[in-house]
Amino acid sequence: MKTYMASASTIERKWYVVDAADYTLGRLASQVAAVLRGKNKPTYTPFLDCGDNVIVINADKVKVTGKKLDQKVYYSHSDYVGGLKETTLKEMMEKKPEKVIELAVKGMLPKGPLGRQMFTKLHVYAGPDHEQAAQKPEVLKF
């Protein structure tokens, strides 16, 4: 009997929708990253993008514990001298709540071309509505 190895042409992709309301940020991000990688499937193959598409709604209602709202800082750089910008989690949740979940999930995916390809299957929306209704996504519970 031979060991089964999935190929890019045999992978079936599903669409899932996750309601981020009442979930903790890190716990939600780790579960979403596992689905994006395909680790929830028996046909998981480390060197292939065998994950599913995930839609996250209500990103503005995600919870964080402790004093992270005031103490967690996101850094970005403009590539100019003195161009380091700092943004707290509280400011980010007010301006771009989608970016908070995207950054958390992106940090849990592999670094490199395969991780970037997996990240393209993540769709995050601040409110309860999304644009992927035509794909008929299934509700994903953790």
From Swiss-Prot:
Q: Name one Pfam family in it.
A: Ribosomal_L13
- Superkingdom classification of source: Bacteria
GO cellular-component terms in the record?
cytosolic large ribosomal subunit
Q: Which GO terms describe its molecular function?
A: mRNA binding; structural constituent of ribosome
What Gene3D superfamilies does UniProt report for this protein, alphabetically? Ribosomal protein L13 (3.90.1180.10)
Any one of the GO BP annotations: translation
InterPro entries, alphabetized: Ribosomal_uL13 (IPR005822), Ribosomal_uL13_bac-type (IPR005823), Ribosomal_uL13_CS (IPR023563), Ribosomal_uL13_sf (IPR036899)
* Alphabetically ordered keywords of this record: Ribonucleoprotein, Ribosomal protein
Q: Which CDD domains match?
A: Ribosomal_L13
| Protein family membership | Belongs to the universal ribosomal protein uL13 family.
Job description of the protein: This protein is one of the early assembly proteins of the 50S ribosomal subunit, although it is not seen to bind rRNA by itself. It is important during the early stages of 50S assembly.
Subunit info here reads: Part of the 50S ribosomal subunit.
The family database entries (HAMAP family) matched by this protein are listed as: Ribosomal_uL13
What protein name is recorded for this chain? Large ribosomal subunit protein uL13
Q: Which gene codes for it?
A: rplM
